[in-house]
Amino acid sequence: MVQSAVTHFRPVMILAGGTGGHIFPGLAVAGVLRARGVPVVWLGAAGKMETHLVPKHGIEIQTIAVSGVRGHGMLALLGAPVRVLPAIFAAMRVLRRYRPRVVVSFGGFAAGPGGIAARLMGLPLIVHEQNRAPGMTNRVLARVARRVLSGFPGSFVAEEVVGNPVRKDIAALPAPGVRFAGRSGPVRLLVLGGSQGARVMNNALPVVLRVLSDSDVAVEVRHQCGEALRAETEGAYAYAGVAARVEPFISDMAAAYSWADLVVCRAGASTLAELCAAGVGSVLIPFPAAVDDHQRRNAEYLVAAGAALLLQQQDRAFYVYLESVLRDLLSNPMRRLAMAEAARGLAKSDAAECIAEIILKESI
């Protein structure tokens, strides 16, 4: 049931949108707050993902007309003040209506105008940055925020590292040593291309696994590829003569991580938080076009801890390196266990609860 705009308790207002990487952490924290009886209202950008996703969780959402300026050329940057000012005024109207006790930015198009409006109105502002390379919006808002929270160390000079929220069923998985104990049969390789798929993985994994079929190690493959690339991925495995379970989407990620001995995936902040919470080693292939190369920065944190290996898809020898890395890891259960335990050691599985506590402490 969607919450009413009129409530005895002043709500927490969440600013987040544009991508799942901003929205899902906000939803996780909203869930904790609502479980404690705290009303939540969302401010998003009109026509973006959040307008469809947030109401499905029973949370009221208000929208403002705003869009990004990065990557749209110099004219867009020069015209940014003209475009942003109306959005700030629109955000102020929403804030006056709801009178939130605190405003929390997880990033995205609406977060900039919403955060600036909050500070102009004297409302407490909290920023949570998911990536090691902060987005433009949170970089600006961090200068005026009351509290600056981060998912990884090194996002800001003055920060509180609280981690990125993950689903409770993933955080509740047994430790790697328990899961892997007595495991026999083929090595279980989980490939995650994301909801849109990752063509480089869809093309490379079948070829590399075909080459590795001459080894003594049997491999069982589960490959999540996105709906649009399903037929292409199935064809690539069939052409390579490699058996694989190809899926457009995996609904039970906790079960998938529990099943896996090793994961090959991108390096988005939420995915890495899940890898750590589950405790599973990984081969990370950052999306090279990610803004500010933030996926590579994210991946380097896990690599430094011994929890992952990093490969760059733009490297000319990418296929060779991928084959070498997989040949080593698939044949070395002790190294896989060490990586999994290192990942688990980085986990901050109570991130959503920690963020909610900070929000309540800063409420007015």
Curated annotation (Swiss-Prot):
Its EC number is 2.4.1.227. It is found in: Cell inner membrane. InterPro entries: GlcNAc_MurG, Glyco_trans_28_C, GlycoTrans_28_N. UDP-N-acetyl-alpha-D-glucosamine binds at T19, G20, G21, N131, R167, S195, I250, Q295. The keyword Transcription does not apply. GO terms for cellular component: plasma membrane. Pathway: Cell wall biogenesis; peptidoglycan biosynthesis. It is a peripheral membrane protein. It holds the Pfam family Glyco_transf_28. It comes from the Bacteria. Keywords: Cell cycle, Cell division, Cell inner membrane, Cell membrane, Cell shape, Cell wall biogenesis/degradation, Glycosyltransferase, Membrane, Peptidoglycan synthesis, Transferase. GO terms for biological process: carbohydrate metabolic process; cell division; cell wall organization; lipid glycosylation; peptidoglycan biosynthetic process; regulation of cell shape. It is an enzyme of class 2 (transferase). Belongs to the glycosyltransferase 28 family. MurG subfamily. Cell wall formation. Catalyzes the transfer of a GlcNAc subunit on undecaprenyl-pyrophosphoryl-MurNAc-pentapeptide (lipid intermediate I) to form undecaprenyl-pyrophosphoryl-MurNAc-(pentapeptide)GlcNAc (lipid intermediate II). This is UDP-N-acetylglucosamine--N-acetylmuramyl-(pentapeptide) pyrophosphoryl-undecaprenol N-acetylglucosamine transferase. It comes from Xylella fastidiosa (strain Temecula1 / ATCC 700964). The lineage of its organism: Bacteria, Pseudomonadati, Pseudomonadota, Gammaproteobacteria, Lysobacterales.
